[in-house]
Design a protein with these regions (language model features):
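Glycine-rich, flexible loop motifs
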Residues: 1-19, 23-50, 70, 77-135
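Short, flexible coil/turn micro-motifs enriched in small/turn-prone residues
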Residues: 50-56, 134-140, 163, 176, ...
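Well-ordered mid-protein domain cores that form the structural environment of catalytic cofactors
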Residues: 110-128, 132, 143-147, 167-188
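Hydrophobic, well-ordered secondary-structure segments
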Residues: 120, 124, 144-150, 217, ...
Length: 512
């Protein structure tokens, strides 16, 4: 099994994916253990002094003015975890919780939180045992970190609350720890607070969304190319010299991908209908510009994610010179903004794909294809309602594109009077990515059927590879009306599992 070693300098997106989705083991480096011990020494020294230190000898949030005596400090740390584990709603996905826990461990190991080495080791042990705390959908405002979600994780460290075992059964966390031979943690000064105060949930979901969107944007280039073929469009608009004079990197990559898929096609380069078009419709001609803008948005989001992965997000933080200082680094605005940017890009990519699908189904705009790609139009409805489903998905995506980060609701008696709503932005982006997959699947279904109805014209070799693979996957070709939902589900799985991309790349080589 793959092992990820956590040091003091952060982790990579690949590390997060390996742990969250691949179940990789986690180990602490010697450097991290030393940094943990050094920072803990600073916290212990400050805890022994009479001066108030936030999170060590004071209350939290609006209660920070309350001095906490020595004998109550362990209870203070337990209490913050218990009281902040106030999430509601359905459980979030296992991969999200594993990313959340791993990224909190990453920050703990930075040496800036004051958490003891044994607490960090217990976090790693829980991940390695396949124990997943029950975390709920609602409870984070994306400022002071993802407080409620991280509190549910910290509760498991204490042997309290509920968690899912490696067999998928939800049980008391204490029982699962005992079976795994893991001792619950007895929290000390600052540790409860340090386990809760980070942007780890929204960051983990951003990293996973970027991984999914990398595949989906390439898949969307493929389906756009297939639609262009089915509509007898021209590939001249994809010429590299046209995109070089507007040098947005994503646009050039998207155009290159489409051109690679279309190489060798007999359906492109000229118009086959009786009334030749001077230009194709925007949804066909401008596909690289729209997809490319989304790719460039992803590039910015990756940069934000990389910076956040290299960050130590906590409040207060332990500095090498011995100070423990309050700060505002827990504010999720940088992550929240790019999550919202991506939701807008996803909605627009889906919108242009739906417009191409609708064009394929309209006999007045499809340049010779039958109405709704039906076998016997009138008796058969063809893909009419598949486009309705696609339109419903796009409408939902437009609602999901409304920024969460533009909103803020004050909390904690107005002490925390501006928040990022980054967790909400991340949750809606996950739904958006899921729906984009379905939208691309419907375009794939329509475009492949349209190409097969162009008898006597040979599609591109890459298109042929996709056609062969999608038919083997159980997506039926042209013919009389039938129960469509199974075909659409098969197309969805074909896109979601990366088989569309893999089929095209058997001919094109790796797409950009």
């Amino acid at each position: 099994m793959h092992t990820v070693v956590v040091g003091t300098s952060g982790v990579t997106a690949s590390d997060v994916l390996a742990v969250a989705r691949g179940g990789a083991r986690v180990e602490l480096s010697g450097e991290a253990v030393a940094a943990l011990a050094a920072a803990r020494g600073i916290v212990d020294a400050l805890a022994a002094k009479p001066d108030p230190v936030y999170g060590v000898s004071t209350g939290f949030g609006a209660l920070a003015t309350r001095h906490i005596s020595q004998e109550l400090r362990a209870q203070l740390q337990r209490n913050i975890v218990r009281s902040h584990a106030a999430g509601m709603g359905p459980r979030v996905e296992r991969e999200v919780v594993r990313a959340l826990m791993f990224l909190r461990l990453k920050t703990v190991c930075s040496g800036h939180t004051g958490v003891r080495p044994e607490v960090a080791q217990t976090m790693a042990d829980i991940l390695n045992a396949g124990i997943t705390p029950v975390v709920h959908e609602y409870g984070s405002l994306g400022c002071s970190g993802d407080l409620a979600p991280l509190s549910h994780c910290a509760l498991t460290l204490m042997g309290e609350g509920e968690a899912e075992g490696p067999d998928g059964t939800v049980r008391p966390a204490g029982d699962l720890l005992a079976e795994a031979g893991i001792d619950p943690v007895e929290l000390r000064e600052k540790e409860g607070l340090a386990l809760l105060n980070g942007t780890d949930g929204m960051l983990g979901m951003l990293i996973m969304a970027l991984a999914d969107l990398d595949r989906l944007y390439k898949s969307a280039d493929i389906t756009a190319a297939l639609s262009l073929e089915a509509l007898l469009g021209t590939d001249k608009v994809l010429a590299p010299e046209l995109h070089a004079i507007r040098p947005h990197p994503g646009q050039g990559d998207s155009a290159a991908n489409m051109l690679a898929v279309l190489t060798g096609s007999e359906l492109t380069g000229h118009h086959q209908d009786d009334a030749p078009r001077v230009q194709d419709a925007y949804s066909v001609r401008c596909a690289p510009q729209v997809a490319g803008a989304g790719r460039d948005t992803m590039a910015h989001a990756r940069l934000v994610a990389e910076r956040e992965l290299a960050s130590a997000v906590d409040n207060p933080v332990v500095l090498p010179d011995g100070r423990v200082e309050s700060n505002g680094n827990f504010h999720g605005a940088p992550v929240a903004y790019v999550l919202d940017f991506l939701a807008i890009a996803v909605a627009d990519l889906a919108s242009i794909a739906e417009r191409r699908t609708d064009r394929l189904l309209d006999k007045n705009r499809s340049h010779g294809l039958p109405p709704f790609l039906a076998d016997d139009a009138g008796v058969d409805s063809g893909l009419m309602i598949a486009q309705y489903t696609q339109a419903a998905l796009v409408a939902e995506l437009k609602r999901l594109a409304v920024p969460a980060s533009a909103d803020s609701i004050p909390s904690s008696a107005m002490q925390e009077d501006h928040v990022s709503m980054g967790w909400s932005a991340a949750r809606k982006l996950r739904t958006a990515v899921d729906n984009l997959t379905r939208v691309i699947a419907v375009e794939l279904y329509a475009a492949t059927r349209g190409i097969e109805l162009r008898e006597g014209l040979t599609p591109a070799p890459a298109t042929r590879a996709v056609l062969d693979a999608v038919r083997k996957a159980g997506v039926e070709g042209p013919g009389p009306d039938r129960f469509l939902a199974p075909d659409l589900a098969a197309a969805d799985a074909f896109v979601r599992e990366g088989r569309l991309l893999a089929a095209a790349e058997t001919v094109t080589g790796p797409l950009r």
